[in-house]
Amino acid sequence: MQIFEELESAVRSYSRGWPTIFEKAKGYKLWDIDGNMYIDFFAGAGALNYGHNHDTMQEKLIAYIQDDHIIHSLDMGTTPRKTFLETFHNTILKPRNLDYKIMFPGPTGTNTVESALKIARKVTGRDTVISFTNAFHGMTIGSLSVTGNSFKRHGAGVPLHHSVSMPYDKYVNDQDSIAYLERFLEDSGSGVALPAAIILETVQGEGGINAASIEWLQKIASICERWDILLIIDDVQAGCGRTGTFFSFEPAGIAPDIVCLSKSIGGIGLPMAITLIKPEYDQWGPGEHNGTFRGNNLAFIAATEALTAFWQDNTFSKSIIQKSKLVRQRIDRIIDKFPSLQGEARGRGLMQGIVIPEPNCASEICKAAFDIGLIVETSGPNDEVVKFLPPLIIDKEGINQGFDILEVSMEHVLKK
């Protein structure tokens, strides 16, 4: 680890929390250079929903490269691009009666958010965007402006304008955040201009695994319709099956105006992002938003295979929901077994967590878990949540093995 300390920027973070050199990974397991095996409850921060090195994705990528096919192409026409567009439309959009234009904004989550904010402002002619407490939407200036975390916002180095933060669902106990939002929009003295868009995560991944209720999401959608505000759903982490359905908003029965996808849309962990835009709002001029690496053909190959292998029917979705029930059972068991932690369960699907109010306790648990073979991180504004984000392909044995390690880690921390 000395090389990283000496040569790499101080901005690095994950290598500090997991101080080893990883060498190999398959499915939901990783190995370091010393042969130590780790259960993965992190999944590349949600970029590895289909696990590490999925066999057929791996095979198709190797074959494509060996045949000297196009790797880099910006937004030029290529066979992988064409095949992905057709597959995504026929496998994901059409069965859900969703009609979107598919935009490739650049390869990261913040790219898709930036493009969503830009097109919303262009279409409406307004500049303000409403976001929510504890939101996280990315690390570039536009995305940071709608992010709640003060540490990350401060890193911008400049004032962040044209956004207003509103309370997320259940942010304040016994307070109706919907009524609060409606009052701000209705009252000409609120100081809040009619916004171009409202942007939200249905489950706040970095903000503490806060899951919005179905009713709250439906009311937000109704507000947007009433006031002619565009609804942007940031599904970068909660999408691609993470909460049980391909899109996290499906259970609410809503159809956002714009949807942001990245992370696991690339299938095997390759950089890729897409922005889904209702056709009437696809008012870009050619090249008005672009990027050198928005045509990642290797990601198109893996993404298409992921859609074909996992999303032709609802079998995979059902398996995620079943596994999520086991995760919740293990969380409830921990809460009962360790009452001194004052734990609280949060999240849905395979995007869950335990809130531990004692300062630094969640971080200590994650550190202890790493030492005995579990990769798991914290979430929340004060790192107060132990966050569970395993690959969606994990089996029951892997879930139980990971939680067994977690319980041992908690016992170790509580004995200190």
Curated annotation (Swiss-Prot):
PROSITE patterns: AA_TRANSFER_CLASS_3. InterPro entries: Aminotrans_3, Aminotrans_3_PPA_site, Dat, Ectoine_EctB, PyrdxlP-dep_Trfase, PyrdxlP-dep_Trfase_major, PyrdxlP-dep_Trfase_small. The modification N6-(pyridoxal phosphate)lysine is found at K263. Keywords: Aminotransferase, Pyridoxal phosphate, Transferase. Its EC number is 2.6.1.76. GO terms for biological process: ectoine biosynthetic process. Pathway: Amine and polyamine biosynthesis; ectoine biosynthesis; L-ectoine from L-aspartate 4-semialdehyde: step 1/3. Its cofactor is pyridoxal 5'-phosphate. This is Diaminobutyrate--2-oxoglutarate transaminase. It comes from Virgibacillus pantothenticus. The lineage of its organism: Bacteria, Bacillati, Bacillota, Bacilli, Bacillales. The gene is ectB.
